[in-house]
Amino acid sequence: MSLSKQVVPTHRVEIAPNSESTCKMDHSNYQHNGLITKIWGTAGWTFNHAVTFGYPLNPTSDDKRRYKNYFISLGDVLPCRLCRESYKKFITTGKTALTNEVLRNRHTLTKWFYDVHNAVNNKLEVDYGLSYEDVVNKYESFRAKCGKPVPTVKGCVTPLDHKAFSFKKLYYMDAPIVSLDKVENFVRIARMRGISDKYFCFLELATVLNGDFNELKKQSSWEYRNKYCQKKIRHMRENAIPSIEEQGYWKGTPTIDELKLLLFLCSNLNRTEVNDAINNVERLESTHYIEN
């Protein structure tokens, strides 16, 4: 069996059920604030990527004008002031500028919006490791395909098996990635905090593959990794679980839940926050709070 086909068994790990929120807030004092980006952002990206994949293969002058106006206007209506300012800057400068060449055909427009999405992620210091081809494969799976005509239904009827495949693609979410060399800084502290061995299985696979995400994506455990990480992230958000310890012995280092994410080469933290956490772990070691 080739290295790329090797699979290290990954034990299934469970996530505790959500606790009911007791937060009661008077929203009247916040009516002029924007909306939380992590709530509307994913849906916004999905819709606007879909808009670009609906662009004609050979657009007319009217098509180009309408789509250009749409993407320019988008910068005026995003429900977050900083997002609006950032988006407007991206579409007017550098390789993410919305030029006439961008509107040449479907390929150029979809590639442009992919670059915009990456530029935003880079500014936020997060990485998902998705290539343009990955995005194309996902959104092309959403394209309607006609099966046998049904007398009682007008228009194209998409076969159920194709719909099922498309919905699986829609609901399958990629989780953020963190490089193996960064995660290795947290392995010792994860073991010291009593995290079960079953959480280290994916890390063992990543080590065998030298942290190569292209190879990791070929493994059957990659899909499970993404599903687990997305469930863990959701669990932390819905239960207000922090990513960094705020007090006590481990202050400044990742919480238990965040360490479990890191062992799957994932994190809620951005690049700067991961580096800060590494520095805090090293500081503990240097001051002998963590015994050798």
From Swiss-Prot:
**Catalyzed reactions:** 2 R'C(R)SH + O2 = R'C(R)S-S(R)CR' + H2O2
User: Main subcellular localization, coarse class?
Assistant: virion
Highest taxon of the source?
Viruses
Cofactor(s) required for function per UniProt: FAD
Q: List the disulfide bonds.
A: C80-C83
Alphabetic keyword roster:
Disulfide bond, FAD, Flavoprotein, Oxidoreductase, Virion
Q: Where in the cell is the protein located?
A: Virion
Reported EC number(s) for this entry are: 1.8.3.2
Supply the InterPro entries for this chain: ALR/ERV, ERV/ALR_sulphydryl_oxid_sf, ERV/ALR_sulphydryl_oxidase, MIMI_R596-like_C
What are the residue boundaries of the ERV/ALR sulfhydryl oxidase domain, all occurrences included?
33-139
Q: What does this protein do?
A: FAD-dependent sulfhydryl oxidase that catalyzes disulfide bond formation.
Q: PANTHER family attached here?
A: ALR/ERV, FAD-LINKED SULFHYDRYL OXIDASE ALR
Q: What is this protein called?
A: Probable FAD-linked sulfhydryl oxidase R596
